[in-house]
């Protein structure tokens, strides 16, 4: 046994001597290549990987395990960084307050354009020929002959039809074109929304708590007496003292609707149901009429009330979360770009954005799948342990 051990030791010493001689002859680049190869071999060894994992698990058993293992003096410096982060959040809050001031300032500049939009939609103003000229995209351009033919056809149709005023059902069409809004609109809501003339957004004044109001302007109708229905959203743009690191810009904290003065028998947010009840003793049957809530877009103006404690049940929380999303979408997208949602162009742009991301993901998946299905594919050839992407 001793002779075998001595022989193995001798062979090992010889191997080491050979390695030393080779290393003396190799260039620095060759040494790097060998180091890479050795690293690859080590990382493919299950025993080595298991040992490394065990060591890492012991060092960092929880996400904060490493932080807890730091010396006290280092922890103090980390706390200093956290205090700096809080100050960054406070500056960011100030930034968003100034953005809100800019929104209010530019809302005044946008308003004359929105006023003219309102007048065109509601047949108060008839745009001139020059204002109606629109150069289509290159792919939409057609020959002069086809243009003339289309013009003649349009004139014939206009003669056959009664002359429409403004742009009929403008806002209803916008709502029906947008999934987020069309899901709210029921069939019994549509006749009412045909009377919707305009939607406006009003920002809180300087020095007031951050908020905005959505105004829905209606023409006189047979359903309610209100000329304007409002929805007010209260916002906060400051870090929460209890969790300052969660601050990520202004957030909607609550909302208030308005009372709709429905005309008799026209309240679409309620419905009457009839229920038969059988008397247990006598066996007689009676019909009971009961009024219950009904799905409707106009429930948007009666959001759940948030108690002072702030505690809400799951249903109320879900309703408010959806409500906030809708309010934000109306303010940021629908009101400024309504004509593009009316024509569907804004929706196509949104779909294109999602399609591009989806196509990229699909292409990546196809490439990976092709490699795996290729019998000649060798995953080791793709490994490059020398590269390290910087985050």
UniProtKB/Swiss-Prot annotation:
Lipid linkage positions (S-farnesyl cysteine):
388
Where are the N-acetylalanine modifications? Answer: 2
List, as start-end ranges, the regions of compositional bias called Acidic residues: 11-28, 132-143, 346-376
Q: How is it modified after translation?
A: Polyglycylated by TTLL10 on glutamate residues, resulting in polyglycine chains on the gamma-carboxyl group. Both polyglutamylation and polyglycylation modifications can coexist on the same protein on adjacent residues, and lowering polyglycylation levels increases polyglutamylation, and reciprocally.
| Keywords of this entry | Acetylation, Cytoplasm, Isopeptide bond, Lipoprotein, Methylation, Neurogenesis, Nucleus, Phosphoprotein, Prenylation
The task this protein performs is described as: Histone chaperone that plays a role in the nuclear import of H2A-H2B and nucleosome assembly. Also participates in several important DNA repair mechanisms: greatly enhances ERCC6-mediated chromatin remodeling which is essential for transcription-coupled nucleotide excision DNA repair. Also stimulates homologous recombination (HR) by RAD51 and RAD54 which is essential in mitotic DNA double strand break (DSB) repair. Plays a key role in the regulation of embryonic neurogenesis. Promotes the proliferation of neural progenitors and inhibits neuronal differentiation during cortical development.
Protein name, entry field: Nucleosome assembly protein 1-like 1
- This chain's source organism reads Pongo abelii
